[in-house]
Amino acid sequence: VYSMEHGKHVDIEVPAAMTLNEIWALINTSEKTRKHCMQLENCVYDFFELTTLNMAQQGLFGEILHVEGAYIHNLEEFWPYYWNNWRLDYNRAFRGDIYATHGMGPACQLLDIHRGDRMKTLVAMDTKAVTGPKLVKQYQKESAPDFQNGDHTMTFIRTETVSYTHLRAHETK
């Protein structure tokens, strides 16, 4: 927001915003200042993802009806280094996949999302929180019986043309 208000176009790495209010602040500021604001997703540029996209565009897989993506990341050694424990605090208060675009970006490319198809229905479920409360106790020295985000989140998205994608996220172990 600051950069757009000071005349700069902005590229943002994920997570660019964590709440709907933060998302609307980015959109409204971009529209008001007439500056571009683009969320980047580094996972669409990896060798495997680009190779798979190239193969799909050449028709090697036929009609694609189902894709899966994931962000399974063991962050155990990094928890003490997050600024003000933002990530642990977010997981304690909210449920869902913080980095959905890591799995969703490549899947959307394969399914031509916003290039002929679009997401229509989303269902997300998670396991109970086992690791999160242990991390709060270890790093914040308090109990967290109210810890919200489960250890593993599964998201299913159906598209307008009835293809679907399955995303998995696991980041607390």
Q: For each predicted feature, which ranges?
A:
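Beta-strand-loop-alpha-helix segment that lines the small-molecule cofactor/substrate pocket
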Residues: 1-45, 59, 173
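Coil-to-beta-strand transition motifs
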Residues: 61-62, 161-164
